[in-house]
């Protein structure tokens, strides 16, 4: 397969429509040749050799009409005025733009299997070779010469092992007869890995460039050529191992080496040797730059093979990651006070634990026999007009009684079996970052600083690495050691306590923590000790909660029942804290609060705030900031109205929906670096000054910037139905609020929102329109769908002061909205849409003006699909 193209154009070339000033002012010569050949076809077919070969070459020469330095002179006139052939050639090359490209590629060179022999791991068929070489030469007015070379050589090895299973109990049917032995009977072990792959690549990029010396007004100053080289060697191998049918393992190790064999006298960052090309030192694998190791484990927990737990499906996944990164060469030999230090490299690891569990409760109910019983039907009289038979009625009475009993029993079973499904997902992510690490990994991987650390373990390795002299001892080292921890819990359940009533429960909890510290390694002789400096912890927290007890209590700009409870709860919480810590409850300040636990102490405000807005008793609420168990929120939908004759007569469908979401969020918490623990065996006045803040309260070990409580009824209630005449009606009420408490200024911000929506929809079936778009029939028959929504939303923001009777509305607005749309399908692919949106906003504060927005128009939508 050979393709060739060529092009030539001269100055003044152009189309008839182009004027003289628009035509080309340069001569262009260009050709391009590309060849694709499978060289393996030239060899005997029985060898099975595949050698895909690709060669390409192109050149482009652009000669301008005018000289590039003297723009008002033609190039020909300058060449004629040249004093010598050397000067003439110099002027010509200075004006020309010349580019030459060459590429040689062998991609996918391999031997295919030509026999039915059993594959072996040492077969050459498992190997694939790749070679790619590209070269670009260029010169123009500014660049005297430039050469770019890119070389890539790779080898890939892949082999899939045939499974060798060990199943010792598979055929022992006489020994394992019961279902409870199934978990042991199904025991299996795969003795060989599933697959092994190995990839290696040599990548070399070379660039040489020299700028042209143009009109320097004297002899050339001898601008040096610029060199840029990027030589790397990449090596990676992967092992996939299905240890059992339920347990699989994946391990990948990857190395990235930097090759720097082009420096004179092997001095890194020194002078480069100009004579060396991409082929010199080709098999020099260089020094490690980056190394990573990844371990993945998936385990299908066989608990469902035990009959009692057959309703449980559980999966555990683990991933561990390790990465070593070379440090900067600039800090490899850093001098300070006559000593030379190495600031080292960085290592980091991470792991992830995922547990996904599903409980199919219907299987559990069937296993324990909690299923509804069929209702026996009473035999009716067979002959119309026949008088009742007293004996038969007497026989049917026990059946009717049993039928009522069965219905009652089934109703109870419906309630007991209302939980249909439970889903529990837990994930935990951990990571460690350690700078100043002096060790270098091996070629195929490393087990330092510990085997566990390289596979993702979060065991503390700081002190071990320091004792073994693996950390830098530079006294002014300021990179931080860091760890991260994230825990996520999601719980959901589906309930159906009665027919057509579906309830979805959801709960979640998220905890994120980041720990950082500076450190110093003190060297005393041959002993090294790790010293932690300025430890700091920060993070955030979020959990689903329940605020419905105060959702409908009075709360406006004049007063708030929950806020008044918040104020009153402070004293109760303060006395509890003082009592729990062994402080004197009767030793009070001017406001009547125990000393050290004042009315504006963070330790007092937080539980008092949570108790007030969640409707809990301040005498029983937890005084800590974090909660362990998420409280579920819910979505509810009832569609059982259509069972009743009146609804069935007047409606096609009728549903009632309700939803509730509420969360408790700590936006940021961090450790108090100024914290000092008080001695509660002493009275308040005898405490050390450093245990108290400026307000005289005991300092808190953890500081919070602000906490938020959010609540949404989405919707509070929604009625959605369609009448028999195809009129669709939707009525919806939404309610939400956001309460934020700032510990910086002890201000509470409350954002309230209420929205009312009424929607109408109607479909005119088979509306006929005369149009040429319909083809020969000249008539389009389609449905016209119309929809209108009217909404009113009120929201306002109120700032409340704890110690002042001065609530203020700082923002808010009332928004009226009207949306109307109509769509009509002119064909299978063409739809026309008319829309009209009207919005009017009236703000709650006098400094903002009312605003009206109207959007209307037509949309034509064409679907290019089938």
Where are these regions (language model features)?
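Exposed, low-structure sequence patches enriched in small/polar residues
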Residues: 1-866
